[in-house]
Amino acid sequence: MSGNTGERPFADIITSIRYWVIHSITIPSLFIAGWLFVSTGLAYDVFGSPRPNEYFTESRQEVPLITGRFNSLEQVDEFTRSF
């Protein structure tokens, strides 16, 4: 036999006007905030990932693949010097 936790049933919550008043504002706000975070380029700055125009430089147009097993550190250093 299960006990009562005292919480409202989920069906009561999602059918209440208060739920939809709150969430009709917060859900679009979160979407707009995420879109602005990505479209302004702040996401690239925060996470340190290169912007789409920085993947390939003028001096290096090939894909930076690590091909050697024993000289991988030198290859990584060579790739990072071009940034």
Swiss-Prot record:
Cofactor info, note text: With its partner (PsbF) binds heme. PSII binds additional chlorophylls, carotenoids and specific lipids.
Gene3D superfamilies documented for this protein: Photosystem II cytochrome b559, alpha subunit (1.20.5.860)
GO biological process: photosynthetic electron transport chain
Localisation: Plastid, Chloroplast thylakoid membrane
Binding partners and assembly: Heterodimer of an alpha subunit and a beta subunit. PSII is composed of 1 copy each of membrane proteins PsbA, PsbB, PsbC, PsbD, PsbE, PsbF, PsbH, PsbI, PsbJ, PsbK, PsbL, PsbM, PsbT, PsbX, PsbY, PsbZ, Psb30/Ycf12, at least 3 peripheral proteins of the oxygen-evolving complex and a large number of cofactors. It forms dimeric complexes.
Family: Belongs to the PsbE/PsbF family.
Protein name, entry field: Cytochrome b559 subunit alpha
Protein's organism: Physcomitrium patens
